[in-house]
């Protein structure tokens, strides 16, 4: 048993206190007073964080109440033989109950879609061009020609990449900063596997960084998951899946990512 589950272990060995339920009930009853006291007395950053948390809780509560109201409200009874017949394309509008059900279905689909495309790190600090690029001066008149740039962050370069002639190469990606594999963690299985990178899908800082294959924190990459044996809904073996980088590769010397499932 893990070390942090000593309470569960003690309860299994010796049982719970006789007044456990009573103490839990009293604690729940005091919760409202505690929140009221915090709302009145907290100051500064703690007050801001508390207000933000309460705001999110109230939004969820209002949504739940609205869903219950939509479920409980009964629509107008349907007429067996309406005096004014309605064409087929307007039948849904005449039935408020089905309209509410349809509205709830659309909302739930939107929520599922939002959850599907949610990422572990929604916000990251942007990277400026001064931080990413280092100016390289080349040519006979070195003091004039400073249009070349060396990328100072880790990058991914595909196997089919061919360098342009040195004279026309604007962006230089050093070999020592190129990554081909990432340590990808599966969120549900809690296993970490080293998988080859297939490409860079999106760098949140700049579209140019995506084109150059810059690997920074929060970047969405595509990895080869064929070794994991994952299958699609149709039963075919999944080849590539997206993952988000969770560390700073330039500081750690390795690439850690979480699989988006």
From Swiss-Prot:
Keywords: Nucleus, Ribonucleoprotein, Ribosome biogenesis, rRNA processing
Coiled coil: none
Pfam families (UniProt xref): Ribosomal_S8e (PF01201)
Motif Nuclear localization signal, residue range(s) on this chain: 15-22
Biased composition (Basic and acidic residues): 1-36, 66-82
Classification via InterPro entries: NSA2_fam, Ribosomal_Se8/biogenesis_NSA2
Region (Disordered): 1-44, 64-97
Location relative to the cell: Nucleus, Nucleolus
Keyword Cell membrane applies: no
Listed GO biological process terms: maturation of 5.8S rRNA; maturation of 5.8S rRNA from tricistronic rRNA transcript (SSU-rRNA, 5.8S rRNA, LSU-rRNA); maturation of LSU-rRNA; maturation of LSU-rRNA from tricistronic rRNA transcript (SSU-rRNA, 5.8S rRNA, LSU-rRNA)
Gene Ontology annotations for the cellular component aspect, listed alphabetically: nucleolus; preribosome, large subunit precursor
Superkingdom of source: Eukaryota
UniProt entry tagged with the keyword Ribonucleoprotein: yes
Main location class: nucleus
Assembly mode: Component of the pre-66S ribosomal particle. Interacts with nop7 and rrp1. Interacts with rsa4 (via WD repeats).
Family the UniProt entry places it in: Belongs to the eukaryotic ribosomal protein eS8 family. Ribosome biogenesis protein NSA2 subfamily.
Known function: Involved in the biogenesis of the 60S ribosomal subunit. May play a part in the quality control of pre-60S particles.
Record PANTHER family: RIBOSOME BIOGENESIS PROTEIN NSA2 HOMOLOG
Protein name (Swiss-Prot/TrEMBL): Ribosome biogenesis protein nsa2
Species in which this protein is naturally found: Neurospora crassa (strain ATCC 24698 / 74-OR23-1A / CBS 708.71 / DSM 1257 / FGSC 987)
């Amino acid at each position: 048993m893990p070390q942090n589950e000593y309470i569960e272990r003690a309860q299994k060995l010796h049982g719970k206190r006789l007044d456990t339920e009573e103490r839990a009930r009293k604690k729940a009853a005091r919760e409202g007073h505690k929140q009221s006291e915090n709302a009145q007395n907290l100051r500064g950053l703690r007050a801001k964080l508390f207000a933000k948390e309460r705001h999110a809780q109230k939004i969820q509560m209002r949504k739940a109440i609205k869903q219950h109201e939509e479920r409980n409200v009964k629509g107008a009874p349907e007429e067996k033989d309406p005096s004014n017949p309605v064409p087929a394309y307007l039948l849904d509008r005449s039935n408020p109950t089905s309209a509410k059900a349809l509205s709830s279905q659309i909302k739930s689909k939107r929520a599922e879609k939002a959850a599907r495309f949610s990422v572990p790190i929604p916000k990251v600090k942007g990277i400026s061009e001064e931080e990413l690029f280092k100016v390289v001066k080349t040519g006979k008149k070195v003091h004039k020609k400073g249009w070349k740039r060396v990328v100072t962050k880790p990058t991914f370069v595909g196997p089919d990449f061919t360098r342009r002639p040195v004279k026309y190469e604007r962006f230089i990606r050093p070999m020592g900063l190129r990554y081909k594999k990432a340590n990808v963690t599966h969120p549900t299985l809690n296993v970490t596997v080293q998988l080859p990178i297939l490409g860079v899908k999106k760098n949140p800082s700049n579209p140019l960084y995506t084109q150059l294959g810059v690997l920074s924190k929060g970047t969405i990459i595509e990895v080869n998951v064929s070794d994991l044996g994952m299958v699609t809904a149709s039963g075919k073996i999944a080849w590539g899946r997206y993952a988000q980088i969770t560390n700073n590769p330039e500081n750690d010397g390795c690439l850690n990512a979480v699989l988006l499932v």
